[in-house]
Amino acid sequence: MAKSKNIFFCQECGYESAKWLGQCPACKAWNAFVEEPTIGKGSAASGVRHQAKASEPVLLSSVHSSDEKRRPTGISEFDRVLGGGIVPGSLVLVGGDPGIGKSTLLLQMSRCLSEQSCRTIYVSGEESLQQIRLRADRLGAFKNDLAMLCETNLDVIQETILKYKPEVVIIDSIQTMYCEDISSGAGSVSQVREATSVLMQLAKRENIAIFIVGHVTKEGVVAGPRVLEHMVDTVLYFEGDRHASYRLLRAVKNRFGSTNEIGVFEMCSEGLAEVKNPSEFMLSGRPEGTAGSVVACAMEGTRPLMLEVQALVCQTNFQIPRRTAAGTDYNRVNLLLAVLEKRLGLKLAGCDAYINLAGGMRLNEPAIDLAIVAAVISSYRNAAVESDTMIFGEVGLTGEVRAVSQAEQRVREAEKLGFKVCCIPQSNMKYIRSKAGIRVIGIRNVKDLYDFICTGRVSE
């Protein structure tokens, strides 16, 4: 006879406790414990231990590596983030804010897979078949039929998968699924963890790629215990400003590929469109000849990404000047402002400073330091930086400009987009092999950058 009891779970890491705790001893999170009913087996509760059958260990040399190739999703930006395509038997978690486009992205992927004659089942626990059909019609005609299932009972879903043996399964969303063996409601910590565990075992045993949609909390992490992210093979976050048209797909965990790649999409009336050249997309509509506007180049994995850095420096009306940073680290901006005040003598203590990465981008790469400094100098001196100039480099506390990685790829991207001048760290100059078509200027310190912005040349 199964015996019911209650256990407290930490919502952050999944730590179990017989009583409520104010602070989790594992992850140190405060007020994170919730009470969940669980089912204990009678034999385990009574202390009776059954004899388990021993498993035979296998020598690694006798295991043949899988010859199965990755299956392309049909969406090149999606394939880039996954590491080249879908790995059979993988469990992929796709998280993001409500309404950001997770279901739309996976429905478009389903359409592309069906066109490749890939057996796919789309399981929805949030929408009816009629609602999914309306969304599918908006995305465009499906050349091949897509198998749909509106179900939240995980036992029924598992039996359906075993019966039809698809190659790819999409679960939308994991918070709506429930197991009958767990007495708590759908979306609870124990239900989400158990459902993910069942799907993981199913994916490995049947060699089926399973995508699960997970909603995020107000802190921006997937709802449910943090152990959920440790159970899956890949964790993708679909993010972006809901008021902007572009979306970014990032991998924060990937057992089968890099976590440094991003996929860029644009939300349009027909769904999500791939952005093949994100640099050109980010710089569209940039004003020319305006003080405080500078183009920088950041690296997202192996892809150079050009973006506009904006700065507004003006006289303050408060005793303590305001400092705001949108899209980059606030403390880093304060550090750079202090460097300018100390090394160049700029009177920034009496000025408000507002820093913004145009388009709602969020970056913390040190390589955009020099562009932030250039934008601040440009706004402070009211001297516009030429629109065909691109700047990148890391700035140290002594005002020196340090080398950054992949400098040649950044310069090559600037040349491809028609930029004529590129200001880079002096220590990176020796690694730039091709300078045809673009003028590359080495910057040793912030004084060199100040001279370039004010006079157009750098002192020897």
What are the residue ranges of the model-derived segments?
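Conserved RecA-like ASCE P-loop NTPase motor core of nucleic-acid helicases/translocases
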Residues: 120-124
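Peripheral, non-AAA+ core regions of ATP-driven protein-machinery
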Residues: 2-12, 16-80, 87-95, 100-107, ...
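Conserved Walker A/P-loop ATP-binding site and its immediately adjacent core
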Residues: 125-131
